[in-house]
Amino acid sequence: MQNKKYYIEKGTKKFIAVTISLFLAGFATFSILYCVQPILFVLSQNFSLSPAQSSLSLSSSTAMMAIGMLFTGPLSDKIGRKKVMSSSLFLAAFFTFCCSKMNSWEHIIFMRALTGLALSGVAAVAMTYLSEEIHPNTLSFSMGLYISGNTIGGFSGRILSSILAEKFSWKISLEWISILAFVFAILFLYLLPSSKNFHSIALHPKKIFTYFIAQWKHPIVSKLFLMGFFLMGSFITVFNYVGYRLLLEPFFVSQETIGILSIVYLIGVYSSPKAGILIEKYGEGRMLIISLVIMIVGLIISQWNRIIIIFLGLFLFSAGFFAAHSVTSTCIGQQARNNRGYTSSIYLFSYYLGSSILGTISGIFWTIGKWTGISTMVIIFLYIGIVLAIKLNYIIDNANELK
């Protein structure tokens, strides 16, 4: 009886509480993380920076988030999921408020790095909490809803920062977003049910390193780690530099319009849970291949020099991305038999490391070939993803036949 699981079922009050609280956590986390993305051009002008240098305001956060996940995951295995997530939200809101008061580029990067480190506690632990507490039959649906909350948060942070930066200043935009995140942190602390299936695990540094290496040797999980790296790297690269494309000749759109363009993210509210459901019909590998092909098609469409066509291309690209992310997140939760918190942390470490490295390096290709250079690089990243998905599909199909 000691190992009996007390899962939260779909339709119950606790399920609703989990959905709302993790939606708020995702909203706060990703509005803070991505609020600088649509104002990279503004930061370039204010501090006389190149596109690649300006992108460090985002890459510093995602890099520190990636590193932090290697520690916050194991920390949550020891002290509990809710404690880590709650503390992370409050700290991230505080660092973002401090960032809004900085006047030098170096100090801004430092504060953004601290913000990313704080946010790692939510990003690393939320999927683990769901995998432990939600009934397995509902997990893919619930994971999709969580990612939908992330999507809306990312969209809202981007559009809010764009509008406030145009009407007032980039400092005011960060200040308002930090206050909103603080309110959501309070609601999260109050609403989220305490873990029922959590069992504390003592992880020492040597064991953490050993487990890290072991997971990279796993035939399925290791490929999911690489998939996350190229997926997120591709997504961030496109949205880091599309603003530069549209703010310059021949479009000259407003900063506010760049924020509104983020509305394409809302397709993730549909495609994330939908992909979770379609896994049962087509399998993880096939769903990943379909999602990646949709991303490539969207990117090709975005080459046309008409804003409505570019919008359509980004819409398809985003739909494919959020579907693929939902599939990989669900698969990680299912494959991690022990130390789920740390396995999820390694996946997200790879995911955000891809964002940091590829998102900044791709600035060189913007300088060389503008949008064509960016698109070429991203298609190469996605082609690697398709190769990984084909291998995953083969391994998973063979494993299912042996059952």
What does each model-found stretch correspond to?
Residues 2-12, 193-225:
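Juxtamembrane intracellular "pre-TM" segments in multi-pass secondary transporters
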Residues 17-51, 72, 238-244:
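Extracytoplasmic
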Residues 91, 95, 106-114, 308-316:
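Paired small-residue
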Residues 67-106:
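Conserved MFS/SLC helix-loop-helix module at the cytosolic interface between two early adjacent transmembrane helices
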Residues 107, 136, 145-192:
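Helix-loop-helix hairpin linking two adjacent transmembrane segments in secondary transporters
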Residues 48, 80, 101-107, 118, ...:
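Helix-breaking motifs and short loop linkers at transmembrane-helix boundaries and internal kinks
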Residues 111-152:
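Cytoplasmic helix-loop-helix junction between adjacent transmembrane helices
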Residues 285-328:
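C-terminal transmembrane helical hairpin of 12-TM major facilitator-type secondary transporters
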